From Swiss-Prot:
InterPro entries in alphabetical order: KRTAP_type8/19/20/21/22
Region 12 X 2 AA repeats of G-[YCGS], annotated ranges: 6-52
Source organism phylogeny: Eukaryota, Metazoa, Chordata, Craniata, Vertebrata
Subunit annotation: Interacts with hair keratins.
Protein name per UniProt: Keratin-associated protein 19-9b
One family name in Pfam for this protein: KRTAP
Keywords on record: Keratin, Repeat
Upregulating conditions: Expression in skin and hair follicle is regulated by HOXC13 and by GATA3.
Family to which this protein belongs: Belongs to the KRTAP type 19 family.
Main function: In the hair cortex, hair keratin intermediate filaments are embedded in an interfilamentous matrix, consisting of hair keratin-associated proteins (KRTAP), which are essential for the formation of a rigid and resistant hair shaft through their extensive disulfide bond cross-linking with abundant cysteine residues of hair keratins. The matrix proteins include the high-sulfur and high-glycine-tyrosine keratins.
Domain of life: Eukaryota
GO cellular component terms attached to this protein's record: cytosol; intermediate filament
Length: 58
């Protein structure tokens, strides 16, 4: 659970990287780094479900 929140809320702190996914288009890297580094890393994060997909990918 900590991984999900770490990405979802972590991306939020980096610039809405995981909040919804729209922000992930530009701040996808922030979302992945908020989780650990492999939360999509610009591949899954910039999708429409940035937070969910990057968490699932990790």
């Amino acid at each position: 659970m900590s991984y999900y929140y770490g990405n979802y809320y972590g991306g939020l702190g980096y610039g809405l990287g995981g909040f919804g996914g729209f922000g992930g288009l530009g701040y996808g890297y922030g979302s992945s780094y908020g989780l650990g580094g492999y939360g999509g890393y610009g591949y899954f994060s910039p999708s429409f479900y940035g937070g969910y997909l990057s968490s699932g990918f990790y």
